From Swiss-Prot:
Main location: mitochondrion
Entry keyword annotation includes Repeat: yes
Organism domain of life: Eukaryota
Record GO cellular component, one term: mitochondrion
Species name: Yarrowia lipolytica (strain CLIB 122 / E 150)
Segments annotated as Solcar repeats: 3-82, 106-186, 209-293
Protein name per the record: Mitochondrial glycine transporter
Subcellular location: Mitochondrion inner membrane
HAMAP family: SLC25A38
Cross-referenced PROSITE patterns: SOLCAR
SUPFAM superfamilies: Mitochondrial carrier (SSF103506)
GO biological process assignments: glycine import into mitochondrion; heme biosynthetic process
UniProt keyword list: Membrane, Mitochondrion, Mitochondrion inner membrane, Repeat, Transmembrane, Transmembrane helix, Transport
Membrane-crossing segments per the record: 9-34, 57-83, 108-133, 161-184, 213-239, 268-286
Length: 304
């Protein structure tokens, strides 16, 4: 079990790191669109000094995503293994994944609980990331951001927006896992017309087929789950950037709707869908491929 856990830690860390660095511009633009009172994405882009400004906040993003993904994927697999109780693919079945197979309800609950918990654990990094990306605060470094937050808000400042974060992350991950696992079963016959008539002597589909199926399933699932949970993300961002104006979840929702209308809760949705869909496609594809490679090589994973 220890060796298998290392596989998931390494695969999760790598997938999170790659997706964070590649997709940081989407995250920064999403944060600034959500913090503004009606500014369009074009206006936000024009306000940037140089193209490199799009990668402002990459360090905390990479730290949060790499560590968070390592924790999430490892804990998720542990929980799913325990829930599955030894269930395996039936003889003749092939898969794009080496992960345990669960029912829809089990996927929904396990994904939600694990993601919600991990989200709370990495909250301090998330708060630093959001403030560093925004145009409201002008921190000189990550250390300066952390010091300033602690000086003005104490330890409590690192957990602003925790309720909105949990309300966003748990449903998002639960819905994501539900749709992701279903799509992985449905997509092979849709994307590849001859895949169901090919030989079933192999346990998994080819690496290329698996990557295509997993990426499309991940991106589609992320788009659906993101749309459903975007209001919570908007509220979370406001609470972390202006805690005095948005002191708690319910007050924040009321304030936003009263002053900007209900549509403001979906501000930044297009950017978030783009980022989440791409992030899911990249991270889950890399993660599942690395886990399968370790399994095929019968290796315990890199030494940590």
């Amino acid at each position: 079990m220890a060796g298998k856990s290392k596989n998931h830690i390494y695969a999760g860390f790598t997938s999170g790191l790659v997706s964070a660095v590649v997709l940081q511009p989407f995250d920064l633009l999403k944060t600034r669109v959500q913090q503004s009172n009606g500014k369009s994405m074009v206006q936000v882009i024009k306000s940037l000094n140089t193209p490199l400004d799009l990668w402002r906040g990459t360090l905390p993003s990479a730290l949060r995503m790499s560590v968070g993904s390592a924790m999430y994927f490892t804990c998720l697999n542990t929980v799913r293994e325990a829930v599955a109780g030894g269930r395996r693919l039936t003889v003749g079945d092939r898969s794009t994944s080496s992960l345990p197979k669960l029912t829809n309800t089990e996927n929904l609950i396990s994904g939600g609980l694990v993601r919600g918990t991990v989200g709370l654990l990495v909250m301090p990094i998330t708060v630093i990331k959001v403030r560093y990306e925004s145009s409201t605060y002008h921190y000189k470094s990550i250390v300066d951001a952390a010091t300033s937050i602690y000086k003005h808000n104490g330890m409590r400042g690192f957990f602003y927006g925790w309720a909105a974060t949990f309300a966003r992350d748990a449903p998002y991950a639960g819905l994501y896992m539900l749709f992701y696992e279903q799509l992985k079963v449905a997509l092979p016959s849709i994307l590849f017309s001859d895949i169901t008539t090919s030989s079933h002597s192999e346990k998994y589909y080819s690496s290329w087929s698996s990557a295509m199926i997993n990426s499309v399933a991940a991106a589609t699932s992320a788009g659906i789950a993101t749309t459903c949970t975007n209001p919570f993300d908007t509220v979370k961002t406001r609470m972390q950037l202006a805690p005095k104006e948005y002191p708690n979840f319910l007050t924040s929702v009321k304030t936003i709707i009263q002053h900007e209308g209900i549509q403001a809760l979906f501000r930044g949705l297009a950017l978030r869908i783009c980022r989440k869909a791409c992030q899911a496609g990249i991270s889950w594809c890399i993660y599942e491929d690395l886990v399968k490679r370790f399994e095929r090589m019968n290796l315990p994973g890199p030494q940590l």
